[in-house]
UniProtKB/Swiss-Prot annotation:
GO terms for biological process: cysteinyl-tRNA aminoacylation. Belongs to the class-I aminoacyl-tRNA synthetase family. Monomer. Its cofactor is Zn(2+). A motif ('KMSKS' region) lies at residues 261-265. SUPFAM superfamilies: Anticodon-binding domain of a subclass of class I aminoacyl-tRNA synthetases (SSF47323), Nucleotidylyl transferase (SSF52374). This is Cysteine--tRNA ligase.
Amino acid sequence: MRLYDTLSGGVRDFAPLRPGHVSIYLCGATVQGLPHIGHVRSGVAFDVLRRWLTAKGFDVAFIRNVTDIDDKILHKAADAGRPWWEWAATYERAFTAAYDALGVLPPSAEPRATGHITQMVELIERLIERGHAYTGDGDVYFSVATLPDYGKLSGHRIDDVHQGEGVATGKRDQRDFTLWKGAKPGEPSWPTPWGRGRPGWHTECVAMCESYLGAAFDIHAGGMDLVFPHHENEIAQAEAAGDGFARFWLHNGWVTMGGEKMSKSLGNVLAIPAVLQRVRAAELRYYLGSAHYRSMLEFSETALQDAAKAYAGIEDFLHRVRTRVGAVVPGEWTPKFGAALDDDLAVPAALAEVHAARAEGNRALDAGDHDTALTHAMSIRAMMGILGADPLDERWESRDETSAALAAVDVLVQAEVQRREDARARRDWAEADAIRDRLKEAGIEVTDTADGPQWSLLDGTDK
């Protein structure tokens, strides 16, 4: 198997540190708000990697963290008049619901940043002792100048680096980045040898990686927007602490709209509830996973409907075989399918094999060759199962699609409905109306009743 490693800048042969075992760390969500389809693409992409490695016989340890303490979380919770931990927990549930709706397997462990403060403090102490970090006005900073090859992941020249953290009086060098933030009034804080405070984002992931996977592990994954500064700063800390850290760095491309990254700050996000009105969850999963994980995925309604139609074609063939021939159990994937996934997870080529098998199977079925049709159907089930979208899997077939979508959407929407109620309680009518309008754009109608707010999909489905 070969994978593209961002650090080396090319495709390399992959072999795990421990034979038969693969360790993967995926940078998860900063739970500050509702997830959109851009957020969950990495979850789908690396779920395929995990499923493929498992199918090949590896024991996979898959860690996906939750960043539950962050400047944005604190600011948004404060603006809404809610405790920061409640805010984080609310949107953590929303992300979990989104992953589940799309059939992403639960991680082996899902550590929260706030549960690993002790490990972060210990890491920072090691960096200070080794001369790579220093204190200043209650904060702790990493000294970039002490690591000559800083920038090797992203290609940034060390002299051109600026961390963009604003003016900090305790910084010796504007290239340095924050490991620990000194306590501020009204913010959560924890005791440390250098005073109370809270962790910096880059420190959190290093501590959690090493807590669950050790000082050296196989794969660190995440979106391409994390290459700099987040992953660059993770490497800096780990190497400065004397650890080997990740052997492969994998990064998925963005979901774009109009050629720009899907982002709340750009106002071009597409909420999951809105998409689940147009296509089934399995079809959305198929769409998000159909492009090569490193490529950009430009969203369009046409592309979404084309993906739904392609998925429905696979589903229809499997149903035809089951009706005419009998039970269809997963069989063996084709050699070309396996070769495609071994070539840096080339899902488009793998899907071409699925559709070739479907076409041949349909011809065989029409000709009355039931044995050949069944063989192709069994192979398709195996291949689509590895891609997490087998139409005959109990996950997709046993649950009514509308009910399944509503169950996922309910968790996502309740978070925003609660925000609207909080705004109404503060008599912030403008904010309450803005939230209602955003929900409507996402395909959700909110109605105030004597029993409290009720929401419904604009297609008429009540909740």
